[in-house]
Amino acid sequence: MPVKRYLPFEVEVEDITLPDRTWPDKKITQAPQWCAVDLRDGNQALIDPMSPERKRRMFELLVKMGFKEIEVGFPSASQTDFDFVREIIEKNMIPDDVTIQVLVQAREHLIRRTFEACEGAKNVIVHFYNSTSILQRDVVFRMNKDQVKTLATDAAELIKTIAQDYPDTNWRWEYSPESYTGTEVEYAKEVVDAVVEVMDPTPENPIIINLPATVEMITPNVYADSIEWMHRNLNRRDSIILSLHPHNDRGTGVAAAELGYMAGADRIEGCLFGNGERTGNVCLVTLALNMLTQGVDPQLDFSDIKHIRRTVEYCNQLRVPERHPYGGDLVFTAFSGSHQDAINKGLDALAAKVKPGASSTEVAWEELRSTEWEVPYLPIDPKDVGRDYEAVIRVNSQSGKGGVAYIMKTDHGLKMPRSMQVEFSAVVQNVTDAEGGEVNSKEMWDIFATEYLDRSAPVEQIALRVENAQTENDDATITAELVVDGENQTVSGRGNGPLAAYANALESLNIDVEIQEYSQHARTSGDDAEAAAYVLAEVNGRMVWGVGIAGSITYASLKAVTSAVNRALDFKHQQLQNGGV
């Protein structure tokens, strides 16, 4: 490897020494001020930047989760961002207790455009920045230290002046010496002090000083040392909210944020599931739930992390990896037999604390919530974030999952979702346990068809008619001719898309369907191409997968819902399959 091409941090920037550091002895006992930057810092890093509709979905999610400061865009950089800021202001989408944040470079015409975008908003943080690092000064801007500082102070003066023309808004200020980690700390202090002097904050109306690891360049302990040094040495510290903005270039963004917070910071900016340029911004999900595992209230609502993940995946058009902390498909799944045994014993011990002598299957989760969580291999109760135990406690029946998935994909063209692979391999295992021997490819297909495709009771689809409304929300109306328990029925429903409309129609039959996960793909190609659809649904309280295969994605999806309904309502089958997903 060409190791000589790379300089250590102490040579490239400086050697930060803080022999009397205090942060290692600190503990995190309360949540920081949070600022979600998904709509700007996250959005700019997407292959397919968010449409206005996806931005609205993300904004609504962040508000629902409890974020009080939300960066909504860079309105001077694009018309799309400008229009979105205007929309949420003019449509009164911003709650009174939420402050929107807008990003702007320290350039006059951009600053003026930013104020135009924010006119009429109640609470706004104007976040202005310029790069101060050695590399950017020398290579990008070709400015000396005084010129870079003047750029920052001139912007501060202009912002204060323009704000007087918009007296109806509660303005707050945030300044970032961008590329802070590549900047000498004494020079960063010099620039920040100069900006603070211009803005003239008070303890009652403080300025936010954001110290971003725009590029993560060194170990988290050095970042923490630099934050503690700034915390101690900045002028007018009592009038400053010290903010962190870590990136994850070295894979230690979460650690840098936690140690930086211990070192004296008050506030953290980041993105849900760590979206952002290159390796991403710090993950606010991981940070917040790390605090929860230590008994610290993160002041954010993660009680339905599956919904949060689905929304983020939809808005970002990026998949959350299976191993992503707290939110990935597999983070609460143990494939090792010894791990599984320990988890089972831990759940039983938890139940026995509530009801002596009882096992975990004999105590309701609501009762378990009254006791402290102590289960091996699970740092958090999955149900506290809206996950469940099924995948955790059934691992021993799931051996062979990979082989089953491979045959179904290569021989039969079905790319089952991962958690469905687990479910179907358990179905196959039931057959092999009962009959012995191996299951070949044809036998496996027959098991699959019997399990998912051939069920016509208690609900059989006869005909479906779907009408899509030409609206922004993709509303759909469905009329379904069914045979239910041997009787012909015609039901209608409306919803945001065909699946939601069909679920709405089934309500009239006292069948409650909530779609939890959905995926689809082409199974074959050519004139007679088929689509396969998979639906994980909660049907009258039972969580089951359904599968549909048809000539169109829409009808395959609707057949998948019917498949899930029939599996859920077939109690004898549920006993055979021992609990579903």
From Swiss-Prot:
Ranges where the Pyruvate carboxyltransferase domain occurs: 32-306
List of residues binding Mg(2+): 41, 245, 247, 281
Pfam families registered for this protein in UniProt: HMGL-like, IPMS_D2, LeuA_dimer
Superkingdom as given in the UniProt entry: Bacteria
Keyword Hydrolase in annotation: no
Location within or outside the cell: Cytoplasm
Reaction(s) this enzyme catalyzes, per UniProt: 3-methyl-2-oxobutanoate + acetyl-CoA + H2O = (2S)-2-isopropylmalate + CoA + H(+)
Renumbered residue ranges of the record's region Regulatory domain: 455-581
EC number: 2.3.3.13
Entry keyword set: Amino-acid biosynthesis, Branched-chain amino acid biosynthesis, Cytoplasm, Leucine biosynthesis, Magnesium, Metal-binding, Transferase
Gene Ontology CC, one term: cytoplasm
Family indicated by similarity: Belongs to the alpha-IPM synthase/homocitrate synthase family. LeuA type 2 subfamily.
Annotated function: Catalyzes the condensation of the acetyl group of acetyl-CoA with 3-methyl-2-oxobutanoate (2-ketoisovalerate) to form 3-carboxy-3-hydroxy-4-methylpentanoate (2-isopropylmalate).
PANTHER family hit by this protein: 2-ISOPROPYLMALATE SYNTHASE, PTHR46911
Protein name in the entry: 2-isopropylmalate synthase
Source organism of the structure: Corynebacterium efficiens (strain DSM 44549 / YS-314 / AJ 12310 / JCM 11189 / NBRC 100395)
